[in-house]
Each structure stands twice: as structure tokens, then as C-alpha cells.
Amino acid sequence: MKSIREIYKIGKGPSSSHTMGPERAATLFKAKNPDADAFKVILYGSLSATGIGHGTDRVLREVLSPAPTEIIFSKETIPGSHPNTMDFFAMKNGVESCSMRVESIGGGDIRIPGHRDAESEEVYIEHSFAEIADFCKWRYIHTLSEYVELNEGPEIWDFLMEVWQVMKNAIDEGLKAEGVLPGGLNVQRKAKFLIESEPEEKVPALLEFQKIAAYAYAVAEQNAGNGTIVTAP
């Protein structure tokens, strides 16, 4: 089994392929070109067709800022290419200094054509919970958290704390936000209204249900609004 780091992923909503993947690609390209004074990104296929609705352009501009970024939604078809293909260009004094083609292959993962894909390391050699139980019994491991730390190292707890903090921030920010969600469908945010409304009957179970619903709306609306969230398969 792969690392827990491969399960929980932090990034911009609302789509692993249309926002998280492009965000990761833009972050990588920006790091490779720290001296660029402008960028250009050409989106193809599905990224071009639905990128505006997903906010792909907004996420790319946010990551590549403060340098100005030109986004082109191309209708060109590249034979044999992945449907979520992007071309990145770095500019310096009006001259192209670097380019990179990236494919957003789903799940927030990206691939650079022509480069060998780095295989995700198999951190856990066991393949079932029965095998994990036998291993823990043999090694006198009493909790699953001990088993996780043995395989992942103690730094996994810092990562999971970051995941938990991002989850909480998504709730907090979603409960405060107002207005219409991006995307052109004129959908009004509801989380703030839900958390501030008082039901006619103050039954504890109903109050708890209302709070849970408000939290769920808060995260969903942050996701829809290109907020930073945690995604998991």
C-alpha cells in the first residue's frame, strides 16, 4: 500500500484534474523559472472546454502571480495527447526562456511527457488487514498508529496535522463567506445562513444536524469557489 500522503491531498478545488493538477504543474514550472517576468499557459482538450467553469485560469494566475499570465483556451487537437494537456511558457524581457508540456492525469497527479514517471513508493508491504494484524501481533505493536509511524516515520504526524488544519480552515472560511459561487450558474452560498439561522424548535438533535449540514455546505462551497481543501479517493 502507498503512503498516507498519497491518499490525502491538499489543493485548490473544485476538481483534482482541472484545478489541483494545474496548480501543481504551475507551482513546479514557477519554481523552475524564478526569474521569469511573465508566463503563458495554453490549455487543450477538456481543460480548454471546461476550464473557465472549473476556474482553471483563476488557479493558474494565482499560483503564477505576481507575474502577469496569459491563458489561452485552445481548440487545437494534439494527436495522441492526454485530454488534460497544458503547455507552459516562461518569458523574460519579452523572450521565451523555457517551455514545458504537462498532463493532468487525475487525482491531482501530473505527468510530463518524455519523462519517466516516478513510481509512488510502496510504503506498506502488507496487502490486507489480516496481514497487518499478523504483523502487529508478531512485532508486539498494539495500535494502528504505532504501525503507521513504523512505516511512515514520525514526520507523518506533522503532515496529518497540516491536513487537519486545512480541513478546519475550509470549514471556518466557508462559514464566513457570502455571495454567489463562481462558474456562471448563479448559485448562492448557504453555509453562513445555515450556521446563523435558529430553528423554531431548539431540539438538540436538530441543532446538531443543522451544524453538520452547515459544515458540509461550507466545505463544498469552498471547494466550488477554488478554495484550498483536502481531497481523498
What are these regions (language model features)?
Residues 8-28, 225-233:
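Conserved phosphate/anionic-ligand binding catalytic regions in large, soluble enzymes, centered on
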Residues 44, 55-64, 68-92, 96-151, ...:
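Mobile "lid/hinge" segments at catalytic clefts and subdomain interfaces of large enzymes
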Residues 15, 19-22, 26, 53-57, ...:
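Generic structural signal for well-ordered, non-membrane alpha-helical segments
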Residues 1-3, 33-37:
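N-terminal glycine-rich anion-binding loops that anchor highly charged ligand groups
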Residues 36-45:
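Beta-strand segments within the central parallel beta-sheet cores of soluble alpha/beta enzyme folds
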Residues 22-29, 60, 64, 216-219, ...:
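Buried hydrophobic packing segments
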Residues 2-14, 146-147:
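Generic N-terminal amphipathic, Lys/Arg-enriched alpha-helix
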Residues 162, 168-233:
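Accessory "access/gating" subregions that flank catalytic or transport cores
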